[in-house]
Amino acid sequence: MFHILRLESTVDLSEPLKDNGIIVFQSDKLDLEPSPNLGPTGIDNTNVNLINAKGDVLLHIGIRRRENAFVFNSIPYGESRGPEERIPLEGTFGDRRDPSITVFDHPDRYQIMIDYKTVYYYKKRLEGRCEKVSYKINEGQTPPFSDVLGVTVLYFANVMPRAN
């Protein structure tokens, strides 16, 4: 299933993500220069999120160019975020013309891929199936991606070759 996800928006998936589901966020541009305006937060941050029916952010993937970091976290609805997990941003994107972030939903963790190369495994902290995705940016900043992302939902069983 394909969805259009605009900057500063949240989109309901056609159905909750099932076991071994894959979500691919695709852009048609990549700008890794830090945003010149840090806005009121003081943090250069653009993020995509996987959200359950209760509003919990199951997986937050933040791109902080000024800090040269990907930030991973979970945020229970109405509560504080947990401890951040980080990896370096530099060198992760291979193709600046068609960048992608892919999330493979395993039973106990999320496998995060940048341009289809695994960069991190994030252990699940919250329960529930992903039912929504969002694309956000801190106020007054410029995003590293296009203003509109393509979001594709796939299932491993459907993309794996089968012998007849």
From Swiss-Prot:
Protein residues bound to a carbohydrate: 60, 64, 73, 84
Induction line: Induced during fruiting body formation.
Location(s), subcellular: Secreted, Extracellular space, Extracellular matrix; Secreted, Cell wall
Domain Galectin, chain residue ranges per copy: 9-154
Main localization, broad class: secreted
PROSITE patterns: GALECTIN
InterPro entries with a match to the protein in the record: ConA-like_dom_sf, Galectin_CRD
GO cellular component, one term: extracellular region
Keyword Secreted: yes
A GO molecular-function descriptor: carbohydrate binding
UniProt KW keywords: Cell wall, Extracellular matrix, Fruiting body, Lectin, Secreted
Pfam families noted in UniProt: Gal-bind_lectin
Keyword Electron transport: no
Subunit field text: Homotetramer. Oligomerization is required for carbohydrate binding.
Function: Binds lactose. May play a role in fruiting body formation.
Protein name in UniProt: Galectin-3
Gene that encodes it: Cgl3
